[in-house]
Amino acid sequence: MTTKTRFAPSPTGFLHVGGARTALYSWLHARANNGEFVLRIEDTDIERSTQEACDAILDGMNWLGLTWDEGPYYQTKRFDRYNEIIEQMLDKGTAYKCYCSRERIESMREDQAAQGLQQKYDGCCRNLAPRDTDEPFVIRFKNPIEGSVIFDDHVRGRIEISNDMLDDLIIKRTDGVPTYNFCVVVDDWDMGITCVVRGEDHINNTPRQINILKALGAPIPEYAHVSMILGDDGAKLSKRHGAVGVMQYRDDGYLPEALLNYLVRLGWSHGDQEIFSMEELKTLFKLDDINKAASAFNTDKLIWLNQHYIKSLDPVYVASHLQWHMDDQKIDTSNGPALTEIVTALSERAKTLKELAASSRYFYEDFDNFDEAQAKKHLRGVALEPLTLFNQKLSELNDWSVENIHNVIEATATELDVGMGKVGMPLRVAVTGAGQSPALDLTLFLIGKERSAQRISKAIEFVADRINS
């Protein structure tokens, strides 16, 4: 049998990290078993579902590279199929119409609560004969009264729920819209899903859905219910912890490889290994190795992974992601070095691509002012001679290379009988406007001869004005 998994988000908000991790686990289980991965949009909550949220989910999945083999399917386009199955269930007696008013249901629950009983539907309409009436009704699934539901969860082991703990689930509301728990069952059946990977908040739904599957004569998939992600304070991850949509991580400068690597380790491990490529994960990942304990989100660990991938991935690939940030920060990359050169030069220092983009601006744009603190420290009167001499030697340099630039810096220091720092730091501030950059010879090379000379001349004027003021 072909392994077939699915990710089935509701488009009522962005794709958050918990959902992304669930999608990743489901995707990996399919890929590890040469199976198929289905994307399904569960949009039966018509009032809360939005196209914007749906687009955000698709964008997030695409950015992460979690490609799907089927879909996206939309539940709102399958209402005819759900209604067809409901009619069959009514005919077979595995579902029934319930005419109980909202007031009666509320009164029933209040009585049950007062008696310390479990609050569930009492089956008032369960055995009523069909009647011709205009009264509003819902349709309920006739849940078995005896026995229990037993299933072996990949994460939590054997789970058993007595049927007398389950009530007769509403599968179609008074407005004619089929309910989530029912649509999920029909979809998983029709789509041939063999393993359902989802959050632990769905555990209570599972026995209900299994009973409906049994009533339909449908195969029962395997299940894996993964634990929630916590904030560093032990509470459920939420916006106050900085929990955001997946695309916000893109906007903040993270590579998809870093986020995927981080998410897979939030609950799954393979020895002490921390770094995993997607190809490795396709071989190593097993649902049974997922830890059932909740995992805490650690932003510092994510940053560490991001730094690793910025430094270790192909600069051409990193540059393709960096371009988005350059555009976002309105840096025109046509007026300067190739982005791959920037990645190679700056990757050792950068924590995020957003930071890398911001720190590379001086390679593409001239600046109006020098950093005040750096200028005060390094663009003093003593800097005038090394700046002037270097600029003179620079004009005589025909072969513009890192090695030759380095030789000119050394020659300037030697001729003036000063340390390299006495030449290097004024030059660095002169050409970058600040005090940090890659190696000075590489920095000058990437900025270019003409632009470097212009900036050094500007610094010479700045120092001269400072001396004369």
UniProtKB/Swiss-Prot annotation:
The alphabetical list of record keywords is: Aminoacyl-tRNA synthetase, ATP-binding, Cytoplasm, Ligase, Nucleotide-binding, Protein biosynthesis
Q: Which residues does ATP bind? A: K239
Annotated GO biological process: glutamyl-tRNA aminoacylation
Question: GO CC terms for this protein?
Answer: cytosol
- PANTHER family tied to this protein: GLUTAMATE--TRNA LIGASE, GLUTAMATE--TRNA LIGASE, MITOCHONDRIAL-RELATED
The function of this protein is: Catalyzes the attachment of glutamate to tRNA(Glu) in a two-step reaction: glutamate is first activated by ATP to form Glu-AMP and then transferred to the acceptor end of tRNA(Glu).
Subunit composition and interactions: Monomer.
Q: What is this protein called?
A: Glutamate--tRNA ligase
- Organism whose genome encodes this protein: Shewanella frigidimarina (strain NCIMB 400)
Q: Coding gene?
A: gltX
